[in-house]
């Protein structure tokens, strides 16, 4: 799934961390941001 802004990607990543008990990497793609994508690394969410 592609998120248009970083804030939306962070919220989704935090939700995924809780549900799956894992770390989530956010990457930049042509149309916004992806979780576990193959683009440029932006940040890792651990919460």
Model segments located where?
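Short N-terminal "domain-start" leader segments
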Residues: 18-47
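A short, charged, amphipathic alpha-helix used as a generic interaction element across diverse proteins
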Residues: 2-23
């Amino acid at each position: 799934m592609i998120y248009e802004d970083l804030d939306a990607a962070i919220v989704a990543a935090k939700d995924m961390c809780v549900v799956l008990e894992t770390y989530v990497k956010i990457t930049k793609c042509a149309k916004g941001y992806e979780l576990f994508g193959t683009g440029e690394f932006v940040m890792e969410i651990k919460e």
